[in-house]
C-alpha cells in the first residue's frame, strides 16, 4: 500500500507563537495535508489515519504542549495517546460494521440468498407437482383394482347362483327317475336288472322316493 505525503522543508516550518493559536491552526492544516490518503489505501489504514487526525484535533483544542504530535509530528505511535484505544473501541466497530453492511460482498451474499431462495422455491414447486402426479396415479390404480375385485365378486356370485340352480334341477331329475323305477319294480325287465345287479354285488333295495 502507498501513501502520498509531502515532507516539509526547513523553510516551511513555522515557529510556534506564544499563544500557540497561529502555530496550531497552520500546523494542523499541514498535518492533514501531509497524511492525505490516496485511493489505494485499504479500509483499516484509512481508519487509523482518521483516528490520528481526530487525536490531533483534540490535542490542539486542549492546548497540550506535551502532545506527541507537537513534539515529534512525523514519528507518531499509537502508544503515545491515552484516548486512542477508547476511541477505537467506541467508534471503529460501528463504522466497520456499517462499511461491511454496505460492502459489495454483503450485496453478493444477499443476491446469493435471493437466488437460493428462488431455487429452493422452484424445487419445492416441482416436488409438490411430482407428489400430486404420483398421488393421482396411485388413486387411479387403486380404483381400477377395486373395480376388478368388484367385477370378480359379481361374476362368481352369478356363477354360484347358476350352479345352485343346476343342483336343484338335478335333484328334481333324480326324484323323477327314482319314482319311475319304483313304479316299474314288478316289471320282468326290472326283475332281470335286479337279478343282474345282485349277481354283480351292486343290488340295492328299491325304496320309494
UniProtKB/Swiss-Prot annotation:
Q: Which InterPro entries match?
A: bZIP, bZIP_sf, bZIP_transcription_factors, Leuzip_Jun
The cellular location(s) given in this protein's UniProt record come to:
Nucleus
Which family does the record assign? Belongs to the bZIP family.
From the UniProt entry, list the residue stretches annotated as the region Basic motif.
123-161
Q: Which GO terms describe its cellular component?
A: nucleus
Name assigned to this protein: Transcription factor atf31
List the top taxonomic levels of the source.
Answer: Eukaryota, Fungi, Dikarya, Ascomycota, Taphrinomycotina
Gene that codes for this?
atf31
Question: This protein's superkingdom?
Answer: Eukaryota
Q: Which SMART domains match?
A: BRLZ (SM00338)
Q: Where is this region: Disordered?
A: 90-133
User: Single Gene Ontology BP term?
Assistant: regulation of transcription by RNA polymerase II
Q: Does the keyword Oxidoreductase apply?
A: no
Q: Does the keyword Nucleus apply?
A: yes
> Which Gene3D superfamilies does the record associate with it?
1.20.5.170
Question: Which CDD domains is this protein grouped with?
Answer: bZIP_ATF2 (cd14687)
Amino acid at each position: 500500500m502507498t501513501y502520498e505525503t509531502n515532507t516539509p522543508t526547513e523553510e516551511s516550518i513555522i515557529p510556534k507563537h506564544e499563544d500557540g493559536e497561529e502555530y496550531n491552526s497552520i500546523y494542523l492544516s499541514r498535518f492533514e495535508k501531509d497524511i492525505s490518503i490516496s485511493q489505494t489505501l485499504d479500509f483499516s489504514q484509512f481508519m487509523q489515519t482518521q483516528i490520528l487526525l481526530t487525536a490531533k484535533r483534540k490535542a490542539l483544542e486542549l492546548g497540550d504542549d506535551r502532545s506527541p504530535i507537537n513534539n515529534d509530528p512525523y514519528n507518531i505511535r499509537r502508544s503515545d495517546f491515552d484516548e486512542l484505544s477508547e476511541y477505537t473501541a467506541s467508534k471503529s466497530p460501528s463504522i466497520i460494521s456499517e462499511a461491511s453492511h454496505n460492502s459489495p460482498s454483503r450485496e453478493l451474499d444477499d443476491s446469493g440468498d435471493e437466488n437460493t431462495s428462488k431455487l429452493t422455491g422452484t424445487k419445492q414447486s416441482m416436488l409438490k407437482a411430482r407428489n400430486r402426479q404420483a398421488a393421482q396415479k396411485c388413486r387411479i390404480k387403486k380404483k381400477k383394482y377395486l373395480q376388478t375385485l368388484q367385477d370378480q365378486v359379481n361374476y362368481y356370485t352369478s356363477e354360484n347362483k347358476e350352479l345352485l340352480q343346476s343342483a336343484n334341477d338335478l335333484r328334481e331329475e333324480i326324484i323323477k327317475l327314482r319314482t319311475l323305477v319304483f313304479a316299474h319294480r314288478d316289471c320282468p325287465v326290472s326283475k332281470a336288472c335286479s337279478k343282474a345287479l345282485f349277481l354283480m354285488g351292486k343290488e340295492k333295495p328299491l325304496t320309494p322316493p
